């Protein structure tokens, strides 16, 4: 593995972790954000179409791409709703942990990914680490009873719903063996359709939607870097490195967006995201 390949493999985490930061920075609310983000992803998809990466000779790729893209839009829209309630730094560690748990459980139960005792043992350790890491990143502030906070409770429910969309996006491709640049155009079309449907009954503005195009473009470029890095550094390594997005988004929420945390919460966040990343590395190497 060359050092340059390793640096490129880090870029998906940087790009994907920046998506929600830019969404919140430019504002507009979750419905403008999801419509703009999905249209931005479609711009990248159209670029792939123009350059000949989109193939129309495989109906499975087309159908799975469209459906999985719509599922991603559903997951992202609900994640943005949670962010509007409790902020980026509270949402992203929990969302990342839920996604890892959800995709892992589905893959183990329905796809039989853990076939040896060693995989089962290390997999269970990783799951325990994930739950622990998420709990640490969600520590309440001093004199704060977070469990009695109605917005926090509502956000957790929304994140569970969001996770269903994200897990569906990932596992659908695994089930049918669909992925890579061949599927990205059709996924981006599904995302744009999903984003439009999810926002069509809500007030949106052209300006706010346009400002939120950038996060979608960044998401799509992050995918391209992921596809490039997988054959260079391996699927397990590229997957593990991509989960560093939780560090980018969580710390970006605190230091860039100014979400306030006390010393106890900051300690929990630092330790929690390290534990989540360790768990992601373990899970990545079990694939």
From Swiss-Prot:
It is a multi-pass membrane protein. Its main location: membrane. It comes from Staphylococcus aureus (strain MRSA252). Belongs to the GRP transporter (TC 2.A.7.5) family. The chain crosses the membrane at residues 7-29, 34-56, 58-75, 114-136, 156-178, 183-202, 209-228, 233-255, 267-286. GO terms for molecular function: carbohydrate transmembrane transporter activity. Involved in the uptake of glucose. The gene is glcU. It is found in: Cell membrane. Keywords: Cell membrane, Membrane, Sugar transport, Transmembrane, Transmembrane helix, Transport. The keyword Disulfide bond does not apply. GO terms for cellular component: plasma membrane. It comes from the Bacteria. This is Probable glucose uptake protein GlcU. The keyword 4Fe-4S does not apply.
